[in-house]
Swiss-Prot record:
Binding site for [2Fe-2S] cluster: C99, C130, C190, R262
Group of enzyme by EC: transferase
Cofactor needs: [4Fe-4S] cluster; [2Fe-2S] cluster
Entry similarity comment: Belongs to the radical SAM superfamily. Biotin synthase family.
SUPFAM superfamilies for the chain: Radical SAM enzymes (SSF102114)
Organism of origin: Xanthomonas oryzae pv. oryzae (strain KACC10331 / KXO85)
Sequence intervals crossing the membrane: none
Enzyme Commission number(s): 2.8.1.6
Gene Ontology terms for molecular function: 2 iron, 2 sulfur cluster binding; 4 iron, 4 sulfur cluster binding; biotin synthase activity; iron ion binding
Record keywords: 2Fe-2S, 4Fe-4S, Biotin biosynthesis, Iron, Iron-sulfur, Metal-binding, S-adenosyl-L-methionine, Transferase
Keyword Nucleotide-binding in record: no
NCBIfam families found in the cross-reference section: bioB (TIGR00433)
Protein name: Biotin synthase
């Protein structure tokens, strides 16, 4: 099956996919998935909060916002040795990528060398590295790239026309600017959003449209289901229909055929059957480990058992400490095309 990677999707096209009968949508998504990936392989990442709590933002879903009474207390940045120990445990458990998250609006200049040291140590272990630190300027993105960072996560969170319902302290354009800085230095992007925040299907389509029309599709697209934390404004929001969540995965797979589509937050509350449908619909990445920043996640034993029951296996990724010229990613294709145009 030949699948063209497009950046010119429109709202009506994505709506038509969402509106397909459920079996037909899953069939199309599974066919696209098989054209680009081994359907039995799932990329496994582990996420560690290296700086928890005290964030000045007002994201309505987030227990780390200091303005909400959620029981999360602000903590200092972890020492590099602590991070390396956690990375070693993650690798032993089967993770191929180690993600480091900090509850900052944006990192201060004094923070960058400390995070860079973490990146270098984790990368030297043979793990892919990812960081999510808030907004970056061009110089900070370059410093992280020079330290050996592979991926930078910065989510769009929701559709542009629903964004102001969820967040007031950061503009949508701020997020797009950070993604541009990250792409410009050659970092791979991890960018997705959250569903189940009271949005409509039209808003979910808007989120996928924003992602699928970026200059380069994100290399990883995390689809988070809202974890409702007492004390946050979104606690008590009506739960999303599980089949609607699967539709979100399926349309993401069709619209961004070469991206990793990740089951992210909210997986702890998902049944094994729901997760199996998501894998069938094109999800091929998960966060592995018992905690995602401050919220729960299935324990590794449950995930290993689920993989065995479904005949799935962790994706094997070889990482060299030295940088490759053109890693096999969506962004690399954009980079190559730009280089060819520049030299033509």
């Amino acid at each position: 099956m030949s699948v063209v990677v497009r950046h010119d999707w429109d709202h009506k096209e994505l709506q038509a996919l969402f509106d397909l009968p459920f079996p037909e949508l899953l069939h199309r998504a599974a066919s696209v998935h098989r054209a680009h990936f081994d359907p039995a392989e799932v990329q496994v990442s582990t996420l560690l909060s290296v700086k928890t709590g005290g964030c000045p933002e007002d994201c309505a879903y987030c227990p780390q916002a200091q303005r909400y009474d959620t029981g999360v207390t602000a903590q200092k940045l972890l020492e590099t040795e602590e991070v390396v120990a956690k990375a070693r445990q993650a690798k032993a458990a089967g993770a191929s990528r180690f993600c480091m998250g900090a509850a900052w609006r944006s990192p201060k200049e004094r923070d960058i060398p400390k995070v860079a040291a973490m990146i270098r140590e984790v990368k030297a272990m043979g793990l892919e590295t990812c960081a999510t630190l808030g907004m970056l300027d061009a110089g900070q993105a370059r410093a992280l790239k020079d330290a050996g960072l592979d991926y930078y996560n910065h989510n769009l969170d929701t559709a542009p026309d629903y964004y102001d319902t969820i967040i007031h302290t950061r503009q949508y354009q701020d997020r797009l600017n950070t993604l541009e800085h990250v792409r410009d230095v050659g970092l791979k992007t991890c960018c997705g959003g959250i569903v189940g925040m009271g949005e409509t299907r039209d808003h979910r389509i808007g989120l996928l449209l924003a992602l699928a029309t970026l200059p380069a599709h994100p290399d990883s697209v995390p689809i988070n289901q809202l974890v409702q934390v007492p004390g946050t404004p979104l606690h008590g929001t009506q739960q999303l229909d599980p089949f609607e969540f699967v539709r979100m995965i399926a349309v993401a797979r069709i619209a961004m055929p070469k991206s990793m589509v990740r089951l992210s937050a909210g997986r702890e509350a998902m049944s094994d059957e729901l997760q199996a449908l998501c894998f069938l619909a094109g999800a091929n990445s998960i966060f592995y480990g018992e905690k995602l920043l401050t919220t729960g996640n299935p324990d590794t034993e449950r995930d290993q058992t689920l993989f065995q029951r479904l005949g799935l296996r962790p994706m094997q990724i070889t990482v060299d400490a030295a940088e490759h010229d053109h890693p096999a990613t969506v962004h690399a294709e954009i980079t190559r095309s730009a280089a060819c145009e520049h030299t033509a």
